[in-house]
Amino acid sequence: MINKISRFKILLLFIFIISLTCAQDEELISTPEGYYDLKRFKRFQHYKNIQPNEEAGYTDLYYPDVCKNAIRNRDGAPTFNQRSFPGYTGVFDTLLITKGTNMTLDSTGFLTGLGIWSLLTLCVEGNLTVLYNPDEFSFVPVHRLVILPGGTITSHANSFLFWDTYQVDENFQEELNKRVKIDPFNFFPGLLVLGGNLNLFGNSQLTYTAKRLNDTTLELSTPFLNMKFLWNKYIITIFTESIPQGDDCLFNMDSDKRTFYLIKTNYGTCNPLRETDKLMKVVISYNRYEDNYSSYISLFSDYYGFEPNEASIFITGDSNVYIENYLIKNLGKTKNNAYSDTKLIFSPNNTSEVIGFINGTNQRFRSSLYIEFSNNVIIKNCVIIESSSETRSPLVFFGSNVYLSDNLISSKSGSSLIAQYGTENIQSINNFYFQKGVSHQTASQILNPINMDFGNEGNGIYSVSPNLLSSDDFFIGQNYSITFNFIANRSKITGFDQDCYAPCFSDSINFSNKIQYPVDFKIFNPKFLPTNNTNSDWYILNINDNGNQPGTYYTVKNLTTLDPVQFSLDNSALSFLGLEASENFKMNGNAKRLDIVNSIISSKALTNQQQIISKVSSSAISFKNSYIYSKLGQQITPIDNQIYGSLITPFYYNDSDILNQVKILSIFPNVPFQIVSGSILNVSINLQIISTADISCTFSSDNSTFSTTILVNPSDGSCVLPLVFEKEGYFNLKVTLKISTSKDYYYIVDFPKITVYNEYLFYSGWVMIDSSTDEFLFEGKIFKSGCQQQVLGNCTISTNSKFINGLPNVTETDELNRLFSSGITSINPYEPVTITIPIDKESKKNQIQLFFTHQPIDIEYSLLSIYVENQPIFLLEQLQSGLGSTFKNLTFNYENSKSLEIINISFTTRGDIYLTSMAVYSSAIPIIVTPTPTSTTSTPTPTSTTTSTPIPTTTPTTTPKTSKTTSKNKLKIALPICLFALLVAVGVLICFIFRKKKQKKQKLDNNMEDGSEMSSIKIKKENYNSFNKFKESTVFKNDDFKNYSNPTETTIYSTSDSLLNFVGSDFLNYSDPNIPLSFSKNILEFGLKGSKCDINTFLSDSLRITNNSNIILCICTVLPRNDSGEVNVSPDSFELDPNQSREIEFSLKLNCTTRFFERFAIEARHTHSFKSIHTHLFIHVESKISSKLDIKEIEVKELISQNNLSTVNIANYRGLQVVLRKIKTHSANYTKTYSQAIKKFYTEMDILSKLKNKNIVSFIGCTHDSSHLWIVTEYAPLGSLSSLIHQKKEKLSLIQKVKLMLDTAKGCEFLHSNDITNCNIKSNNLLLFSTMEKDDVCVKISDFGIKKFEVQNQNEKEIFKDEKDQKLIDVYEFGITFYETMLEETPENLSNLILEGERPTLDLEKLDADIRNIIERCWNQNKRSTFSEISISLKEKYTKLLEKNNELIQEN
């Protein structure tokens, strides 16, 4: 028995050893003599959820086994020195720190005992900490540094320098040749990290912002306080637009440690500073040409004066990387030419033996810093410089999550940064990318993307992954600041199965193909400066998809730019959402569809709207709710190449100041509109008016002499004009808004195209069913079947289509459900399905109606395109139906100008949209869509009317006429949400189960309101009722749709972080076949259908629950707790008999601007056994933008300032960097109850939110908690005026100071004109957006109107005890702030001086006479100036100073 057990143990041990051997990540590969043996490393082993294709060639990493035969440390040796490594010779040694060993390196002591070339290779499998020596700079010279899996190197402010073998003295060459073999993959000299930790901490700041004082003098923004040695031990490297690769200088320094006097070196040019350079960054480091070095990784050749060489840093294997305050210089081997990799020739009999090499000439990924498959990479406040040669890129990331902030990257390279495949999350914040332009020959080289070879064009950031966040980055000298290059189905290149942009595949049994989802870019406030080497055609953004099929929908959100953009998207749509463009902005390139939505465009080169897209090739271009600046008195011509499927609702205005008085809230119609001739259409425009001036609306048409003028109704801010269209055709209406107090300025609003139809007759109808015998009769119209593949007949379908029967019911009538029970779609996603049908050749005008069922496979948008005779009708429209099936009705007009007898209709989808039936009308058909005219309570009185043609005519009443359409000729179809299929995969057996669901009936007669639209109308109604640049980036949370297992205890998710547990209850998905309940819907939308609701408004919805079991169940509804909304249900619990249904009613009120995406639980409990199951359903409701915010959406960041009354923080709100002020609520001001005070707070904040002026900070919103009022405003990147002059000690010129005060006075003038006082004027509250005196806006006022919510300081009350008028107090505060700005210091004993009736006099007489006069007028007790007077005086002074500066420039 014992022998049996022993044999069994031995067998288990043998199996264990074999399993360990098989599980090894590395494999040894033998090579020919003279070469290092290689290790084969599974480089993608840590790339989760993706299995690589072994045949792709990129799955294995081969690296030389340089750690073989290394000298190992003594066990437990604590210090890295000669004694710790038995066998150490001191000449070209290879040392290994073993696993479990923790060593420290006192680099000074170590270098004392080692020769320069003593350390050939250092391999780290344990932990090595390099200590910081504050008294002396030290470095670690090494040829090869390798961190093995699990190893860690932590260095504090010391340097690693890599020496190359050719630099070794000839006396040592013979010994070197014995120790060194050939590295075929060119990793060394350099650093190789194979799955460990690299932590590099510099001890001091490296980069500073500076400004030029003269040719040889500059001033730092903050003092240089880190100097420990004499000045000649340091060197300053200057980076500007004219010197993007830096210029080295020695320097002397003033006592303030900010003023630097530059001295030419013996080895650098140190050219004079150029006055034309707008940006200057400097790097101060130890002088590497003397005896010391700064904290950096560099080539050893720099120190010893050899010619520059190359090294590289290669990091892989899920390593952790943290680098801060480090200088990485003169590394990088991969040139900016086509890649040429070394290839291995394996033995035909042994895959672990290499018998030869095909040597490459340009090995990829040997960059200054290359990181792959590492999920934790942070690089901040570093300097990375490549100056020796033209490389591909100093930074390359592959399959990693990377955070870069406040770095300076300088190179002459194809790209400053390349985000390779799999780098789905990279954040670049406030980095400075300097680039010396690449040669035209190199940039124009055509590389091979299939070989992962790209990024040579002169890019800032080059990305092949969509999830790149760039915020406040500076790009200097590139041809393209940011380039996105998308390659569909990346698995062909990377070898990853299912590798496209995550999430990129579906688990559906019907849709096994990979799906390319829409892509959202995140680019905030990029800044670009050209250099002398920049091409004449440069772009801030370049998007390219290589003509890939299928196309997708790209969205660029909230881009703020001064520069052009370019794109090449032959098969895709591009949407700019929330674009703010000015200066040199234009567009160039091609896209299948281009949308510009909710945007502001003001380009200096813009003479008309057409110029924005004059170099754009697109099948459909649309402007939606977008503001476009024009020059005064200039007429802008609307774009005329619109097609069906695109929208155009642009708002033009001549000056941004006009928005201070009038804002356009909405127009109707706001999408292309169709109407039956003889019907009434109420054309309207709704305004938000702050000014009391009279505003007139002049309605006119480009294609007629029609013109009518009416006044805006002051009670509701609307202009409504009822029109009757008698003649068939197209009409382009517009309205001109003029303000009586400023006739030079006006709006022009172009309405979407209005199409007027006569009545047509039903010609034919077809139903998509796999049968040639059936036909359907609907309201007297025959819908035939028989559309077959490759069968010549009345209707033919292309062979790449498939029939799907048993589609879910999407209406409430059996008659309609029969019509939509079957459909066709493409076998392969996005392949066009073509239907050939007969048409009336005698009729020139026809209408075609298509009926689709959208059965979504996920929550993503699905793109739909429709063509007739290869001409686009409907292009790449985004359809979304949540998780329920939905019916879509699309109708368009077709002119049969060639008298064709048959036509080809094609459509493309990703495979989840089915064409179920179609109808053709000709001659005289009743219009399918009858718009509902807009009613109004009162008819505006026309002030003048001129009607030269009867085409549209005004009507004396707003009562709508009845359409001449008869009910028997209408096609009434419901628009519901249906059952969706739950897809469950168990091994190779997959079940696909449908449950029928129903929704409330909604007819197609009013398809402008229900979302099903005709012709050029989008499927989903667009509600452009207000312009708001802060748009949301996401709609649904992915975790709302996870598949859950069946635990006995399940937690309900709530955004308010409340957790509800069901103890002893089994969880089942709502569509699980084992659940005894069925539901009429799984998502409650409260009738919104994707649109947004008003806050503080009650919404209602209902849910029908059916008991499908044979027992009585007790049903209980458990609602989430969420302070952003109030949801109730009635009844919340009840008993439900077998096979019976009951409807429960829900009510919802949203309390603030929020996305109320919640789960709620339905629990079913057996009335006798008390066994219980529960499931989750969903509430998806989003509010419109309001001034009241959801506190949970505000992410509080670093503190800016605080006092006993309030705190100010930087915060994030919906992806936007903002400022958050939190005011304590136990203020002495609150004499009323707490609830009354809160109500007053929201009322006043709502008023402030309506104030818009370029010199006041934008108010985003507010909220409160139990102890604080929260106020969210615009973020100022340059801080406050106080911090500029008191903390940063920046010196301002006289004209700069005048410009700052002029902006302040203009802001105060606006506030006083709107009866807003308590402006709280002080340097802390003047936020800087620029210090360039010629910029339009330099200062914005913050905290106006907020002071009343804080406790007044007692001294402040005494100071102003004699002041009766708050406006005078504001002027006084302005005078004090002006005085403080001129002296650049705060007046002392200010309160005592004022109480004694005096004013500050220190250095007052030294001020400019005009300035002194303005200041004294501000604090004159008898006759104090108004801000209008102050603005005029400052404007005059500013103009004089500007003219004087221009004269000096011309003289020089």
UniProtKB/Swiss-Prot annotation:
Pfam families xref list: PK_Tyr_Ser-Thr (PF07714)
Sequence intervals crossing the membrane: 973-993
Keywords: Membrane, Signal, Transmembrane, Transmembrane helix
GO CC field: membrane
Membrane topology, Extracellular segments: 24-972
Major location (coarse): membrane
Annotated ranges, domain Protein kinase: 1194-1452
InterPro entries xrefs: GDT_regulator, Ig-like_fold, Kinase-like_dom_sf, Prot_kinase_dom, Ser-Thr/Tyr_kinase_cat_dom, STKINASEGDT
Name of the protein this chain belongs to: Probable inactive serine/threonine-protein kinase gdt6
Originating organism: Dictyostelium discoideum (Social amoeba)
